[in-house]
């Protein structure tokens, strides 16, 4: 089972596109169910703005002030620390991007003493929401597709896209530019994103 859980495939085999795709193991999907449930409680609270994870995908605070996703919030660190997800992602990182390094050489980006905690957050998007072309901080980044309705993530510099099947995850070098077009369906779209650091650098 463990070997299968650590398998990823290239999004576009035989090309320079560095995006890798994997299916999320059922037990880890159950953990993510809990994360999303907590995120919904934050989103629906009168104090939601206090927990908002602000980045280019949420609000352009240095420009127009336009919100792209309707709401974003980080996952509570205690949920991440006790998860199989963290071990799984760090082992995937070492296997596919580690260049003979140990999984101990990688960690989830973290904001000590800040309400964001770890650099993993839930995105809630609805009709008209988008995510502008951007890249991420760190060495490696990923997107978890929780409830996506086939709304693709477009990887700009490689001219390819991933449809975002529910229950899958992509990982790619953090400098990879990507975006999501405005959502046309009148449905809730839920994804999670995260950033990994190489601690040996």
Model-found features: residue ranges?
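Catalytic core of non-heme Fe(II) oxygenases with the double-stranded beta-helix
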Residues: 102-182, 187-201
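Non-heme Fe(II)/2-oxoglutarate
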Residues: 1-110, 130
